[in-house]
Amino acid sequence: VSAASTFSAYHHLFLSAYLRPQQFSGDIKSIKDYYARVSKQRGEKLDAPEWVIRELGYHYVGEQNYDKAIALFKYDIAEYPQTPDAYNGLAYGYEQMGEYKKALESVNQALALSTSEHDGHQVYVNRQKRLQSLLKD
């Protein structure tokens, strides 16, 4: 048996630790259900990582399915309320919808939770400036 065959067998046997868009039913409960199955399979408690939830939101923004995207971003914030990236995700979703005031409120929260050393800090600053400019027009 080749190493590639063994890898393929294990790859398909175990659930990925990272939920993909095609595995998301559109219901937030499906995220919890998926990670309950992963946890059971691996014998340890695993929760959806913050970035996985946020990436699902970005995916649905890209498909212009804003209702799903906003629901995911809000769920991300509920699960990770101290994570600035979660608020920036929501800000991005609202910005893409043209909801600039809501986007600004969310990015302001991201900035309140981050420091200048945070990887996304400059992204938040740039988004805040852009939104403030859009709201002046």
Predicted features by range, described:
Residues 1-46:
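C-terminal catalytic histidine-bearing segment of alpha/beta-hydrolase fold enzymes
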